[in-house]
Amino acid sequence: MWKCSTVINKNKLIKAEYHTFYTLLFAMAVNAVHLESDAFLVCMNHALSTEKEEVMGLCIGEVDTNRIVHIHSVIILRRSDKRKDRVEISPEQLSAASTEAERLAEMTGRPMRVVGWYHSHPHITVWPSHVDVRTQAMYQMMDQGFVGLIFSCFIEDKNTKTGRVLYTCFQSVQAQKGSEYERIEIPIHVVPHEAIGKVCLESAVELPRILCQEEQDTYRRIHSLTHLDPITKIHNGSVFTKNLCSQMSAISGPLLQWLEDRLEQNKQSIITLQKEKELLTQELAAL
């Protein structure tokens, strides 16, 4: 319960002692986030694509009058720097994401824009680090409704010895004291969809190509060093080939199998719908 220095009519608060009260009540620009299940699927596939480094992407959607962020699709970004505790992208990709949001807005006739970002936390807690909180605060300076999503993966439950994935949504607010920021957890709801949307399907198919480009960029950057001896270059080439094969086995293969299964499922649905159409046509003709 919040402490108040003055109370009127039992309930009306005039002055709160804690700055956090006003922060939560007035400064929070977003009430909740609705993440569509097909966009959630792409985020999960992206987060699980690599166990050693963090990955990052941008969320495309809209904000309604009730201050609820609706995330309809995501854009997978190619990393310019791969580390286990942080991820960096180029400004050109942010500009390209804004252009993609404008294209989706024209295609759907809805006010689509970049409404948030997501990244993974492999093997660590789902809660944002101080770097994440500062990054989120920087984004909110440009857009108060901007949100951050974190997917914590490759976490083992100590009791059941099974893997689990945790996710959260947050924003940043000014801390009670000092110039630092602190996180506010935003309620997030996954909205079920019977089928995957076209934009999310394109993002899912794009994932193997982006991962391959990242490996190629890393290999070319190292291979261009002039001081490497031939044995080292051969070794680096072998590592590059091994990484590509691992991606094909862990990402491209399962994705292809999933797409083939979805295609077969769609064919069966078409057959079922055609039979229903014939029955309805016969019933209509009998009237």
From Swiss-Prot:
Binds 1 zinc ion per subunit. It comes from the Eukaryota. Residues 256-283 form a coiled coil. A motif (JAMM motif) lies at residues 119-132. This is Lys-63-specific deubiquitinase. It comes from Danio rerio (Zebrafish). GO terms for cellular component: BRCA1-A complex; BRISC complex; cytoplasm; spindle pole. Belongs to the peptidase M67A family. BRCC36 subfamily. Zn(2+) binds at H119, H121, D132.
